[in-house]
Design a protein with these regions (language model features):
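Extracellular protease catalytic domains of secreted zymogens
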Residues: 1-155
Length: 155
């Protein structure tokens, strides 16, 4: 029996180490926008790193797909700092590229590149849940990852 581990690549774009929070409550950028990072354990060569996309439809017909990036939004109703809502990805500073990745991307790739695959992560087309007694839309690679794990389990 084959076992796959699908891991979210994160929802903070290339700013995983900063938790995606990029501004203070007055809107001034406080993050180091030159410090790119990827998420662990998604950078492990032993997992499938799940990125995010945004699906477009025309009625019930698929009309396209783009990289998931919903831009800056407030952290929560009680935290007015802005954070980035976008698929995680990039090049690991620590993990060596696995042989299956260098075979696909070429020998010049020396560090682990992620994500490996991507699935719908946009909040607008994500999942509807009940939260505090009311409907709530969720998205992110933390939703995409278990959805794809379920699909892989059926394959």
């Amino acid at each position: 029996m084959r076992k796959n581990f699908s891991i979210s690549s994160g929802d903070e774009g290339v700013y995983e180490s900063q938790g995606g929070v990029l501004t203070n409550s007055s809107g001034t950028v406080t993050a180091d926008l030159t410090a790119y990072s990827v998420s662990e354990p998604a950078a492990s060569p032993y997992v499938v790193a799940m990125g995010g996309t945004t699906l477009s439809t025309n009625g019930t017909t698929w009309a396209g797909e783009t990289v998931w990036n919903e831009g800056l939004a407030t952290v929560s109703s009680t935290d007015t700092r802005k954070r980035l809502w976008a698929t995680g990805g990039g090049v690991s500073s620590f993990e060596t590229a696995p042989s299956w990745q260098t075979a696909a991307l070429g020998s010049s790739v020396t560090k682990r590149v992620l994500p490996d695959v991507a699935f719908d992560a946009a909040q607008s087309s994500g999942a509807q849940i009940v939260y505090q007694g009311g409907p709530y839309a969720i998205g992110g690679t933390s939703l995409a990852s278990p959805l794809v794990a379920g699909i892989m389990a059926l394959a």
